[in-house]
């Protein structure tokens, strides 16, 4: 049974998700939007989102995921109006049951191909093991003098990369990262009066800013403008703000910084400097 009613954006999104048979957790995996932000959109609480720019982006992703016309949703958001929605009466408990039943069927049907794959992999492993064992058994032993020469050569050769590795390690130790979630701290040892910070993206859009620099007012990085640089003094710490963390790279004096500990949607980085 269907009926045409005016609904808020959040109500339309929620009903479309239910009609698609998606839970919020499944929708989060599909859109890569945090769960609390999905809940805020369904509650029409758009003030909880980072900015109107990200609100529009999240609404567009949500609409695509549940097969809605994203332009209608965005127009309603921009004008603050409601949406005329063809509502289908749906029993949410019934949909949940269907989803569980569907998942059980998928698990049952997918078990057999997995069994055959494991069996095939074991067959290959047994064959390779037998071949290697048979090859080793048929090889004649080398004279002891020849063995000694090979060991000597290997030992002298391997000493070269060791010194290179030590040198590389001393360079990397100049930068250390601590913290996690939406805030990390970077400690950088340097004898310079100023350092160069570079922020770059490949295929995402993110607003970034660097305090105490020419980027203090912020700039938006995107596939059209992929990077921005700032020169900062080392006499005091600086704060880097990221509107979107995922997909943003940071280098300090051309040294790449590991930002994997920043796991939130948005984040802040505090950079402190100590004399080397």
From Swiss-Prot:
InterPro entries: Bact_Cytoskel_RodZ, Lambda_DNA-bd_dom_sf, RodZ-like, RodZ-like_C. Keywords: Cell membrane, Cell shape, Membrane, Signal-anchor, Transmembrane, Transmembrane helix. The chain crosses the membrane at residues 111-131. The keyword Ribonucleoprotein does not apply. Disruption phenotype: Cells are smaller. Deletion suppresses activating mutations in khpB (also called eloR/jag). No change in subcellular location of KhpB. Cytoskeletal protein that is involved in cell-shape control through regulation of the length of the long axis. Probably part of the elongasome which synthesizes peripheral peptidoglycan. Belongs to the RodZ family. This is Cytoskeleton protein RodZ. It comes from Streptococcus pneumoniae (strain ATCC BAA-255 / R6). The lineage of its organism: Bacteria, Bacillati, Bacillota, Bacilli, Lactobacillales. The gene is rodZ.
